[in-house]
Regions:
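Cytosolic juxtamembrane helix and N-cap/initiation of the first transmembrane helix
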Residues: 1-11
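Alpha-helical transmembrane segments of multi-pass membrane proteins
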Residues: 12-24
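Core segments of alpha-helical transmembrane spans in multipass integral membrane proteins
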Residues: 15-18, 35-55, 73-76
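Membrane-interface interhelical loops and short amphipathic "cap" helices
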Residues: 22-36, 90-100
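Juxtamembrane helix-break-helix junctions at the cytosolic face
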Residues: 52-67
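Membrane-water interface at the C-terminal end of transmembrane alpha helices
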Residues: 112-130
Length: 132
């Protein structure tokens, strides 16, 4: 369960997100100011690096607590940013007003929400095993 949870989350934040964002809608968008672009690229590199570390810890060292927590920080950070978006003027909609959704649910919420649920189960199992 722990390996699956971390691997699933890493696949989303270290692979899928860069694939979806290294293009003209994000990194190469003419509508984004340069300062926002540097933050975007920084976030992509940081999250992908965290993901590689998590995979190494889970698959190479069979350690679960730190990779689960790190992955929760990444996915949870997105979820928090999404839910407080009105506070800072954020949006998941593109300039043309469209939004990537699946069955009416934003794909970020669907993916990272699912990953966070798996990660919480992984955290619970990891903590339960440490108490034994």
């Amino acid at each position: 369960m722990q390996k699956f949870a971390v691997t699933f989350a890493v696949a989303l934040y270290a692979i899928a997100v860069p694939v979806l964002e290294i293009n003209e809608t994000h990194v190469f968008s003419p509508d984004w100011i340069p300062h926002a672009k540097i933050h975007e690229v920084w976030q992509l590199i940081t999250n992908s690096s965290i993901g590689l570390l998590c995979l190494w810890l889970v698959w190479g060292r069979k350690e679960y607590l730190i990779p689960t927590l790190l992955s929760l920080f990444v996915t949870g950070g997105f979820l928090i940013a999404f839910f407080i978006r009105d506070f800072y003027g954020g949006s998941m909609k593109f300039q043309d007003g469209t939004e990537k959704v699946l069955s009416g649910i934003n794909i970020g919420i669907l993916g990272f929400g699912t990953a966070a649920v798996f990660l919480f189960f992984s955290l619970f199992k990891t903590m339960k095993n440490k108490i034994k």
